[in-house]
């Protein structure tokens, strides 16, 4: 599932909500329901297009010895996650992002991503697909998540650049949790303004509803 927002650089414009149709990948039975928030102002250059997408177990096809999920999503693992299937997913992801660009008349300026194995899979996504035509760069840090998946940003260097980047370690009852970090970046926009972006994605009921209740409140 992915979400898309147009972020206005004006505070007093009307916001409209609407749902876009489902998309289906040829290779994977994903229902990619896109929700959009679009604001209109005098020029299309007065807003940025911001997107979030949970890529759901975006692992490469090799077993790097980094845990059970890494073995599961490998050529020899239980998912039989081969090189061919990995690059097919890269192509499907790129086509969906390109669809957003066709629809809105510009490519997403910043994309928040969830369930990413490492920076390497994002590098392969950008270099092996049509996304290589665009000036995307990567912000990613490995977290302490038990399954080895993280959050990340892709951003267009012609539109913004990170002034600061930090990770926030989730805590509960004074103890750091072995889960995905919260990623925060303060971005300098090409028009001179600054916008802070935060992306996070956490297990909702890890360990069961009763076990996780305190951490969710």
For each feature predicted by the language model, list its residue ranges:
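Bacterial N-terminal signal peptides that target proteins for export
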Residues: 16-27
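Bacterial N-terminal signal peptides
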Residues: 26-34
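N-terminal, active-site-proximal structural segment of metallo-dependent hydrolase catalytic domains
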Residues: 37-129, 139-143, 149
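Active-site regions of metal-assisted phosphoester/phosphodiester hydrolases
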Residues: 40-83, 156-217
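Short, surface-exposed basic-aromatic patches at helix termini and helix-loop junctions that form
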Residues: 126-133, 155-157
